[in-house]
Amino acid sequence: MIKFEKVNYTYQPNSPFASRALFDIDLEVKKGSYTALIGHTGSGKSTLLQHLNGLLQPTEGKVTVGDIVVSSTSKQKEIKPVRKKVGVVFQFPESQLFEETVLKDVAFGPQNFGIPKEKAEKIAAEKLEMVGLADEFWEKSPFELSGGQMRRVAIAGILAMEPEVLVLDEPTAGLDPKARIEMMQLFESIHQSGQTVVLVTHLMDDVADYANYVYLLEKGYIISCGTPSDVFQEVDFLKAHELGVPKATHFADQLQKTGAVTFEKLPITRAELVTLLTSLSVNSGGEN
């Protein structure tokens, strides 16, 4: 689906202001996967994200998206199809809304790619239903809606382009806890429908709950990758790099360090933690 091979990126190359942001990145996003990218500000994850849909081209190495190869010498006309294959929901996407009605805003993208208005509006209606926005809102101005509803409109607008990969850049930033949970459940539902998803986040619990593969970035390098279950076992390594772990993992690790219990493998979700603690309680129940 998407493959990075020895990708390097330098801002303002061949100038006194040259600044290298990515170093020898090897990365793969498989079809149907839910992949997470984690890193602090300055880790390179935003630069990497912009390579996913051809907004940036590698200084060295190559990015393959489907059957399209993007390198330093690729022409814009060769890269343009990548932007239809990979849809990016940037932080605070509601700031990009502009049309006079919700339906028109969502239909704008498909029309921009040459789809007739009637068909574009049919696609828009399908995607608005998918993101859970009732038809009573479709003829309203997007600016009359709540923040969470506006974000759903923006996400529907990306989905209306029918991308093969949906990239989410800190998608719950600024939302209250209830809206945040609902938004993550929406993305899980979209993933379950067969959509390939890439999540850029700093929230480890979301990675544990939803992703099936994760890459950790630091200063432009991938410092760890694997399934969340494997990566989050390295608690001390993550702490040394000032990266957190899921709350359930932190609790279990602290409990284990007291000597009260030994886990064969640290849980990464609340459900896993409850199951393990219940099992321990049952096993020791005869002594109580």
Swiss-Prot record:
Q: Does the keyword tRNA-binding apply?
A: no
The EC number(s) attached to this protein equal: 7.-.-.-
| SUPFAM superfamilies for this protein | P-loop containing nucleoside triphosphate hydrolases
Q: Which Pfam families match?
A: ABC_tran (PF00005)
Which residue range or ranges hold the ABC transporter domain? Answer: 2-244
Instruction: Tell me which SMART domains the record gives.
Output: AAA
Cellular location of this protein? Cell membrane
Which Gene Ontology MF annotations are present?
A: ATP binding; ATP hydrolysis activity; ATPase-coupled transmembrane transporter activity
Q: From which domain of life does this come? A: Bacteria
* The protein's role, per its UniProt record: ATP-binding (A) component of a common energy-coupling factor (ECF) ABC-transporter complex. Unlike classic ABC transporters this ECF transporter provides the energy necessary to transport a number of different substrates.
Complex formation: Forms a stable energy-coupling factor (ECF) transporter complex composed of 2 membrane-embedded substrate-binding proteins (S component), 2 ATP-binding proteins (A component) and 2 transmembrane proteins (T component).
Q: Which family does it belong to?
A: Belongs to the ABC transporter superfamily. Energy-coupling factor EcfA family.
Q: What name does UniProt use for this protein?
A: Energy-coupling factor transporter ATP-binding protein EcfA2
* Source organism of the structure: Lactococcus lactis subsp. cremoris (strain SK11)
Q: What is the lineage of its organism?
A: Bacteria, Bacillati, Bacillota, Bacilli, Lactobacillales
